[in-house]
């Protein structure tokens, strides 16, 4: 085997939140994800009944999943890991649902979560996320100072809009994002601008932001390929959220088709991965003497 990319779809992103139309049934959502060619899904593991139903479907169709959780303390990770032991998962995606003011207050939490993951033999990735321990870029960089080997899931949309990087993004800010990406073992996909956390990749006026994120994701993939084992799997979760993440017009309708945007993102990232893999293959291919 060789290193592989697996593109997943967020089930949260399948929510429509329309006032005059019902939500898609769960089985419809899962069938859409399968038929669209995704490799799996992001699954909330805080609800055992929900997680069991979803993973049963995904497993029956040869798909994978990440186990998502939102612990407020160390012990809240334990039932998630117990459920992972029963149902399996590629990894646990942990959103630390705490907002310490002091970096020192994070130490026992990070140490505890990592210890539990190691004891269970499960990879635990800490997500960079709004309104969590990792909500601020500089605070998260300080975490990396304390835990240089901390495994992150990179959702960098929050950092672009949170710090409102000047445009074009300068090398200093690129360097800060690159440091996050150098610790990332998974990616959550959403394209932001410096003022909006989620924009459609299809609008002409957004192409500069699309290119920015494709460049960051290229850096992330190349960094991961250097660090990961020869048979490792990188997951990329398409996570285009429903309103109010998605921008709506005066009629309450979204300005773009978010499902179609996710399909476009899936194909863009797979093409990016293939280009990088092809380039790496040419660089490592043995030279034939003439």
Where are these regions (language model features)?
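A short, acidic, amphipathic alpha-helical segment used as a generic capping/interface helix at domain edges
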Residues: 172-175, 209-233
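Active-site acidic/histidine proton-transfer and metal-coordination neighborhood
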Residues: 64-152
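Active-site-proximal loop/turn and secondary-structure-junction residues that shape catalytic pockets
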Residues: 13, 47, 71-73, 96-100, ...
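Hydrophobic faces of well-ordered beta-strands that scaffold small-molecule active sites
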Residues: 3-16, 41-43, 63-69, 92-94, ...
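Acidic/histidine-rich catalytic cores of soluble enzymes
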Residues: 119-204
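Short, low-complexity, polybasic intrinsically disordered segments
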Residues: 247-280
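Flexible glycine/acidic-rich beta-alpha junction loops that bind and position SAM and/or redox cofactors
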Residues: 10, 16-17, 161-164, 191-205, ...
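N-terminal pre-domain/capping segments
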Residues: 1-85, 89, 267-276, 280-290
């Amino acid at each position: 085997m060789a290193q592989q990319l697996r593109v997943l779809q967020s089930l949260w992103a399948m929510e429509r939140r329309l006032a005059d139309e019902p939500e898609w049934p769960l089985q419809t959502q899962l069938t859409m994800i399968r038929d669209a060619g995704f490799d799996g899904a992001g699954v909330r593991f805080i609800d055992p009944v929900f997680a069991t139903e979803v993973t049963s479907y995904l497993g029956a169709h040869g798909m994978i999943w990440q186990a998502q959780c939102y612990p407020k303390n160390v012990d809240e990770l334990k039932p998630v890991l117990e459920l992972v032991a029963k149902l399996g998962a590629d990894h646990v995606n942990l959103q630390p649902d705490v907002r310490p003011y002091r970096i020192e207050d994070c130490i026992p939490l990070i140490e505890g979560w990592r210890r539990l993951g190691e004891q269970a033999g499960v990879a635990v990735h800490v997500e960079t996320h709004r309104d969590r321990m990792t909500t601020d870029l500089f605070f998260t960089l300080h975490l990396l100072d304390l835990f240089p080997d901390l495994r992150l899931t990179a959702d960098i949309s929050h950092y672009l809009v949170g710090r409102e990087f000047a445009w074009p993004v300068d090398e200093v800010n690129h360097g800060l994002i690159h440091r996050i990406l150098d610790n990332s073992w998974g990616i959550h996909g959403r394209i932001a601008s410096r003022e909006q956390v989620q924009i459609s990749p299809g609008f002409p006026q957004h192409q500069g932001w699309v290119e920015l994120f494709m460049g960051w994701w290229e850096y992330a993939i190349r960094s991961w390929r250097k660090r990961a084992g020869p048979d490792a799997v990188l997951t990329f979760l398409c996570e285009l959220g429903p309103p109010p993440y998605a921008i709506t017009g005066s009629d309450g309708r979204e300005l773009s088709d978010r499902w179609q945007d996710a399909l476009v993102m899936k194909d863009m990232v797979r093409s990016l991965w293939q280009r990088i893999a092809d380039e790496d293959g040419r660089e490592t291919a043995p030279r034939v003497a003439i």
